[in-house]
């Protein structure tokens, strides 16, 4: 039982949600959110430059924004918490409302966006729909330290999971992690910038296979490699 619970928690924790504008399968449009100041703060796009971004991250951001000009790539927005309409859609399709506590849900924040600027996960993702590629530009802050001076392996795994998961989701809809294998080649220096390059390799029914590598900005150092399997969720089946 404990093993089953742990697996379920790991899967839920690896959930990748859609960018703004993409709805869950079968969901109906809802009225726009009212403009409360707290909601505006929560829905502030965190994937744009802030003062904590170093020159490497800013330079890469500018380079990929240039690639977006012809429409081949697009930047994905990112927020501190899941927008209200997405929460309602997800609860409707995949969760038993009786098991959800509204107070806990109202306090929830996305793990990778729960740190103050510069202290944790600073990142932005770009997607190429034709090539089925997702690239994440990631700067790991001082609160992500593992071995002295280096980023914790779990933090690296988190960003790999988020990147390959978003790649699978953009290709096929709402997915959850079924398997993630990571080979760590070299430790990543704290507060440095890396590129996480992911690629959709194949699709078998509801199974999406995605691989990725983590490289230095100059692409001369390989830090990690990973393979993954994601399962597309069935709106007709609850997760609880």
Swiss-Prot record:
> Highest lineage ranks of the organism?
Eukaryota, Metazoa, Chordata, Craniata, Vertebrata
Q: SUPFAM superfamilies, alphabetically?
A: Thioesterase/thiol ester dehydrase-isomerase (SSF54637)
Which residues, renumbered to this chain, carry the PTM Phosphoserine? 37-38
Hydrolase: present as a keyword of the record?
Answer: yes
Subunit arrangement?
Homodimer and homotetramer. Interacts with AKT1 in the cytosol.
Which gene specifies this protein's sequence?
THEM4
Similarity comment = Belongs to the THEM4/THEM5 thioesterase family.
Active site at 161
Keyword list, A-Z:
Acetylation, Apoptosis, Cell membrane, Cell projection, Cytoplasm, Fatty acid metabolism, Hydrolase, Lipid metabolism, Membrane, Mitochondrion, Mitochondrion inner membrane, Phosphoprotein, Transit peptide
Which positions bind substrate?
183, 185, 206-207
Q: What protein name applies here?
A: Acyl-coenzyme A thioesterase THEM4
Which residues get modified to N6-acetyllysine?
Answer: 74
Q: Does the keyword Nucleotide-binding apply?
A: no
One GO term describing the cellular component:
cytosol
- What organism does the UniProt record list as the source? Homo sapiens
Catalytic activity reads: hexadecanoyl-CoA + H2O = hexadecanoate + CoA + H(+); octanoyl-CoA + H2O = octanoate + CoA + H(+); decanoyl-CoA + H2O = decanoate + CoA + H(+); dodecanoyl-CoA + H2O = dodecanoate + CoA + H(+)
Kindly report, in one word, the top-level EC class recorded for this enzyme.
Answer: hydrolase
Where expressed (tissues)? Expressed predominantly in skeletal muscle, testis, uterus, brain and kidney. Down-regulated in glioblastoma or glioma compared to non-neoplastic brain due to promoter hypermethylation.
Localization recorded for this chain is: Cell membrane; Cell projection, Ruffle membrane; Cytoplasm; Mitochondrion
Q: Per the UniProt record, which EC number(s) apply here? A: 3.1.2.2
């Amino acid at each position: 039982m404990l093993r089953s619970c742990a697996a379920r928690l790991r899967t839920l924790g690896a959930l990748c949600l859609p960018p703004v504008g993409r709805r869950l399968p079968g969901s109906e449009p809802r009225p726009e959110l009212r403009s409360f100041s707290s909601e505006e703060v929560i829905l502030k796009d965190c994937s744009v430059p802030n003062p904590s971004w170093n020159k490497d991250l800013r330079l890469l951001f500018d380079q990929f924004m240039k690639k977006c000009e012809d429409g081949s790539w697009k930047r994905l927005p990112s927020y501190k918490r899941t927008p209200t309409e997405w929460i309602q859609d997800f609860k409707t399709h995949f969760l038993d409302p009786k098991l959800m506590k509204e107070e806990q849900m109202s306090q929830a924040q996305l793990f990778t966006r729960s740190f103050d600027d510069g202290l944790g996960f600073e990142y932005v993702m770009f997607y190429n729909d034709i090539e089925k590629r997702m690239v994440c530009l990631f700067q790991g802050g001082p609160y992500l330290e593992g071995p002295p001076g280096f980023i914790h392996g779990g933090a690296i795994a988190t960003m790999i999971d988020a990147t390959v998961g978003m790649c699978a989701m953009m290709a096929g809809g709402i997915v959850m992690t079924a398997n993630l294998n990571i080979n760590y080649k070299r430790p990543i220096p704290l507060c440095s910038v890396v590129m996480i390059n992911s690629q959709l390799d194949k699709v078998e029914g509801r199974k999406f296979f995605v691989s990725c590598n983590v490289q230095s900005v100059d692409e001369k150092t390989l830090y990690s490699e990973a393979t993954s399997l994601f399962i597309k969720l069935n709106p007709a089946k609850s997760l609880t």
